[in-house]
Amino acid sequence: MLKILVIDRCHFTRTGIEALLNHSGRFSSSFLVSGINNLLLAKEHILQWKPHLVIADLNSFISETHSSPPINPFFMSCGVIPLILLQSADRQHAPIAPSQSVAHSVLTKHTTLNTLSHTIQEALQVRPALEIPKNATPLLTPQEEKVLSMWMDGVSNNAIAAALSIHGKTVYTYKRNIRMKLHLGNRFSPFLSLPGKGD
């Protein structure tokens, strides 16, 4: 089972790529797809989970971040892992110009599904010889991903507990597990570089 990490602020892009990989019938391999909407957490996610391919729209983070986003640490964490960069054609900022040694391909989000599928197949063929586990597991459980998403949106623990129908103490446990898995130093770590946080 091949592990693919999709990094994009857009929920529809993350779920759409997962549907393309797992439900379109275009691929013969089986995939475990993990989606993340936070560039700050992407580096640790890559280092801990070791995906076989990373697909990312970095422009969405640049346009929404007032301070400089952690682009270079992101590229360094990818290392030899193939990277497909997606770019929104309707954005009004300068595109990211990664070195050719870093990105396998740069595509717009208006690329056809055939082209995207072909590019993914190519990237997976040139990937480094990483161990392919028979039963891969995501770094975060689906429930932890929900808690992280709401936590990043600034939702209170009580509201998270109510939304997920869990006890308030369970929210603390999930947050502790997320911090341990992503090697975050303290409970405020996910918010250190987000605009408007900590002011």
From Swiss-Prot:
GO terms for biological process: phosphorelay signal transduction system; regulation of DNA-templated transcription. SMART domains: HTH_LUXR (SM00421). It holds the Pfam family GerE. Residues 133-198 form the HTH luxR-type domain. Residues 3-124 form the Response regulatory domain. The keyword Repressor applies. The modification 4-aspartylphosphate is found at D8. CDD domains: LuxR_C_like. Keywords: DNA-binding, Phosphoprotein, Repressor, Transcription, Transcription regulation. GO terms for molecular function: DNA binding. InterPro entries: Sig_transdc_resp-reg_C-effctor (IPR016032), Sig_transdc_resp-reg_receiver (IPR001789), Tscrpt_reg_LuxR_C (IPR000792), WalR-like (IPR039420). Residues 157-176 bind DNA. May serve to repress the entericidin locus in C.freundii. This is Transcriptional regulatory protein EntR. The gene is ecnR.
